[in-house]
Amino acid sequence: MASESGKLWGGRFVGAVDPIMEKFNASIAYDRHLWEVDVQGSKAYSRGLEKAGLLTKAEMDQILHGLDKVAEEWAQGTFKLNSNDEDIHTANERRLKELIGATAGKLHTGRSRNDQVVTDLRLWMRQTCSTLSGLLWELIRTMVDRAEAERDVLFPGYTHLQRAQPIRWSHWILSHAVALTRDSERLLEVRKRINVLPLGSGAIAGNPLGVDRELLRAELNFGAITLNSMDATSERDFVAEFLFWASLCMTHLSRMAEDLILYCTKEFSFVQLSDAYSTGSSLMPQKKNPDSLELIRSKAGRVFGRCAGLLMTLKGLPSTYNKDLQEDKEAVFEVSDTMSAVLQVATGVISTLQIHQENMGQALSPDMLATDLAYYLVRKGMPFRQAHEASGKAVFMAETKGVALNQLSLQELQTISPLFSGDVICVWDYGHSVEQYGALGGTARSSVDWQIRQVRALLQAQQA
């Protein structure tokens, strides 16, 4: 129970804490986000104390009623913090004492803030993972729906930012959607490891008062119970794993944003962002800036920084709880907010994006079919390495003559290889080009349709 100073640990101390240290030590400015889960954990723990014979039924009911009142004040915005509330646990317990009196002092029996805070954090992150999963699934669904609707749109595929081969626009969309399905799968795995109960571990050695941890697990709907009390109160690998998940997901989203930023420039003019996800210039009236995509790209760095920062905090800690672990919550809250905003904006961008199909088609050029020319010779029986060389010679001949690759005459092609014949004309058809990539995972329509079915099946399985 809080001492006269309002501290949960004040009995050992005589002098007052330096005001600068008081401010430096406090975490209430951000861990107030945990108010709801802190109340949930305390309600479950009071039931555990009652079962262990450490609270009477009347005392438990009094505490539960008081905690309901605390939660009501938080929900209605009427909860008043005071200067001694260094963290959410202190604030809630102080208010509980004001509401129900000395009985509130029994709630912390056998419980440490070490196991209390990590329980709160796991509860909060478990819900956050579920929320972010829903947002990520919605983005992937939006991308797949778009890919299905625009399957017949062709445009240049790029490697090294150089035009490479004709592909379906849908194939590009699905390349990013598939990456995001791995992110959604990873997030489910992270949630599974978060969903483990540490409450009942005490500060380091465990709980000596017969509290039933299985009851606590059931009350808070955790999937399992931590195996070791020292590990339970000090380990933050689940936080690091969440931050790494966010970093990897942001890597994928940043790459997609970078592509779209390029595609919406005048130089490409393949797509146009909706006004709802663009801004203008304060000086240049003609400008339409892709700020939504640029912010997605830039916020990846913010998330990476939080992940690296936490790992640097964790790597030098001795065993069990240290105050350094207070740094975990700001990282989690900020990254969670960032991911929520980014996923919603990305979904809005994709759902409202306008494509310029004519410009995409005009960007296709015969030189992008040089690989197809090599495949043509392979189908005639030429080894691929020779076919690659022959196609390269055709490209050089066309460049030397200042003509497009498909403008070389049959006679000119036959000077390179006698295997060229009149049916080489089929090579110069972009639709024919993409359709030859019918192997699973390719850009042919049958393969794109298969990819769409597979991604939808993955989403359905993940949501089951």
Curated annotation (Swiss-Prot):
- In this chain, where does the modification N-acetylalanine occur? 2
As one GO molecular function, the record gives: identical protein binding
Name the chemical reaction catalysed here.
2-(N(omega)-L-arginino)succinate = fumarate + L-arginine
Impact of mutating residue 237 to N?
Answer: In ARGINSA; severe
Effect seen on changing residue 288 to R: Refractory to inhibition by TSA and NAM and by addition of extra amino acids. No effect on protein structure
What residues does 2-(N(omega)-L-arginino)succinate bind to? 27, 114, 159, 289, 321, 326, 329
Effect seen on changing residue 398 to D: In ARGINSA; impairs tetramer formation likely due to protein misfolding; loss of argininosuccinate lyase activity
Phenotype when changing residue 297 to Q:
In ARGINSA; reduction of argininosuccinate lyase activity; no effect on protein expression
Result of altering residue 95 to C: In ARGINSA; loss of argininosuccinate lyase activity
* Top-level EC class as recorded in UniProt: lyase
Increases basicity of active site His, annotated site positions? 294
Consequence recorded when altering residue 87 to G: In ARGINSA; loss of argininosuccinate lyase activity
Active site annotation, chain numbering? 160 (proton acceptor), 281 (proton donor)
> From which domain of life does this come?
Eukaryota
What does changing residue 326 to L do? In ARGINSA; severe
For this chain, the Swiss-Prot or TrEMBL PTM comment says:
Acetylation modifies enzyme activity in response to alterations of extracellular nutrient availability. Acetylation increased with trichostin A (TSA) or with nicotinamide (NAM). Glucose increases acetylation by about a factor of 3 with decreasing enzyme activity. Acetylation on Lys-288 is decreased on the addition of extra amino acids resulting in activation of enzyme activity.
Q: Which GO terms describe its cellular component?
A: cytoplasm; cytosol; extracellular exosome
Where are the N6-acetyllysine residues found in this chain?
Answer: 7, 69, 288
Q: Which family does it belong to?
A: Belongs to the lyase 1 family. Argininosuccinate lyase subfamily.
What the protein does comes down to: Catalyzes the reversible cleavage of L-argininosuccinate to fumarate and L-arginine, an intermediate step reaction in the urea cycle mostly providing for hepatic nitrogen detoxification into excretable urea as well as de novo L-arginine synthesis in nonhepatic tissues. Essential regulator of intracellular and extracellular L-arginine pools.
- What is the associated disease? Argininosuccinic aciduria: An autosomal recessive disorder of the urea cycle. The disease is characterized by mental and physical retardation, liver enlargement, skin lesions, dry and brittle hair showing trichorrhexis nodosa microscopically and fluorescing red, convulsions, and episodic unconsciousness.
What name does this protein carry?
Argininosuccinate lyase
Q: Which organism is it from?
A: Homo sapiens
Question: Organism classification, top ranks?
Answer: Eukaryota, Metazoa, Chordata, Craniata, Vertebrata
Gene encoding this polypeptide? Answer: ASL
